[in-house]
């Protein structure tokens, strides 16, 4: 009788030992229990009900190694969706934080905030004040390397001017939240890669 994840280990063990395993839907055994004269629920009664249900089924389907693989795939799929939702929430939080400290930056990066170049920049300099004080060569190189050559030195100059004129709040608490949120997003990115590779 299916007991959700509680019986998975037993099913896997029995299949690995080449036993024929059939997992019954609890709805079927529940109906059989209702028809049972003795209403007391004990292990012996449960065993009897399950055995009787098995005997009365014409379409028994036994668990195979393929079924176990599919169970693993479904579990990974559910975990992947959960991880994506976590990452999405973090990205929304990050956008909120950046809007408070450097609202102009979203108009500078046309592809949006969620790209390697922006993450690399904000991890090192999470406020416009810090970006404005960065050495131009370092800023230009940081953007170029993390965008695979997409950003030029001229664009780095434009960004620094934008940072100097920003109306954003210079808030160290939000800056910490920005850097740590990016680290969490990157961790989830790494985890998703491993999950998808396993799938």
What role is predicted for each listed range?
Residues 1-199:
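A detector of single, family-specific signature residues
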């Amino acid at each position: 009788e299916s007991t959700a994840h509680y019986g998975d280990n037993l099913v896997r063990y029995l299949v690995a030992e080449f036993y024929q395993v059939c997992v019954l839907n609890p709805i079927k055994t529940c109906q059989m229990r209702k028809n049972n004269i003795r209403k007391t629920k004990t292990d012996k009664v449960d065993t009897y009900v399950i055995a009787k249900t098995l005997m009365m089924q014409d379409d028994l389907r036994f668990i195979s190694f393929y079924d176990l693989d599919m169970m693993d795939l479904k579990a990974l799929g559910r975990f992947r969706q959960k991880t994506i939702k976590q990452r999405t929430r973090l990205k929304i939080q990050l956008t909120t934080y950046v809007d408070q400290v450097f609202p102009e930056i979203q108009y500078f990066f046309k592809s949006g905030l969620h790209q390697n170049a922006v993450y690399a920049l904000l991890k090192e300099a999470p406020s416009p004040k810090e970006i404005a004080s960065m050495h131009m060569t370092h800023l230009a190189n940081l953007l170029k390397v993390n965008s695979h050559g997409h950003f030029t030195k001229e664009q780095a100059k434009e960004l620094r001017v934008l940072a100097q004129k920003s109306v954003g709040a210079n808030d160290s608490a939000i800056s910490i939240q920005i850097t740590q949120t990016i680290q969490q997003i990157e961790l989830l990115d790494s985890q998703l890669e491993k999950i998808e590779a396993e799938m």
